[in-house]
Amino acid sequence: ISLASDKRFSSYFKKFQFISLTNFGTAFGMGLLVMVFMVGQGYFWQPVVGFFGAFCGCVVSTRLMQYFVVKNFPHYAVEDVIGNKQEIAEEEKKVEKSGFIRVLNSLLDGGRTGVDVGLAIIPGVLIISTLVMILTFGPSSTGAYTGAAYEGVALLPRLAEKVNFIFEFLFGFGDPHLIAFPITALGAVGAALGLVPNFISQGWVDGNAIAVFTAIGMCWSGYLSTHTAMLDSLGYRELTPKAILSHTIGGIAAAIVAHLTYMVIMLFIAA
């Protein structure tokens, strides 16, 4: 967002390319955190497979977004983001600032942007993550509610069992509870990562699940919470539905690629 506000940076793009930066940036927004977390759980090459899947999902999402933008606004294919090049020329004529001032400005501007985005995504994070946790996990082992964490009504696993063959075919999920990760990642990938240790302790997770979790966690990165705020800050709020649709498809593609890549690698290892 900070780069997008820079007129000189924006001048390198046509409008349809500039708008798709939202999808491109979201696909890798939490990449380092997701990969480090998975490595910390004892998995090493599986997150790399997930990274490859996220890269493929990013390509799908970004190109789809560009297609939708050009289809609905054909003139965006030829229009520059900065129509008046004189503005850039005037910026270049400004007096050069000292290194200290530039560092200070970058810290202040970056901090303000971070706080703005954080405040914008809090409602989505709280609402989506809370709902998913309530709908994923059941009561305690005694069947009673004790007020402990991860106690809910376990509706999602019951529904997932009905269509588990779809998730098993596309993602290789061996347990219906695992569908909670991608659903939570819609709102906040950090909250989705918090589910993984519990999944591991329950014995539901294997290497394939880690690869798929990494891919879909990186690619989606809580985009339902952030896309609206990002496009609003860029001035294209009306394109939010297109961005969300494109990124939904991109995340699914990332998970499928990660699953297939993992299966191919396992075939070579077995051979």
Language model features: what each stretch is:
Residues I1-V60, V189-A271:
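C-terminal transmembrane helix pair
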Residues K7-F16, I88-A89, A144-Y145, L170-H177, ...:
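Short juxtamembrane and helix-loop transition motifs at transmembrane-helix boundaries
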Residues Q17-F18, G25-G29, F73-G83, P139-S141, ...:
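Structured catalytic/translocation cores of nucleotide/phosphate-coupled proteins
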Residues L21, V78-E90, A149-V153, P182, ...:
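Juxtamembrane non-transmembrane "cap" segments at the membrane-aqueous interface
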Residues V39-G40, Q66-P74, F137-T142, M263-A271:
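Transmembrane helix-loop junctions in multipass membrane proteins, especially transporters and channels
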Residues F51-T113:
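Long, contiguous bundles of hydrophobic transmembrane helices that form the permeation core
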Residues P74-K97, I122-I127, L156-P157, L193-V196, ...:
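Short, charge-rich amphipathic segments
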Residues E92-V189:
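Transmembrane helical segments that form the transport core of multi-pass membrane transport proteins
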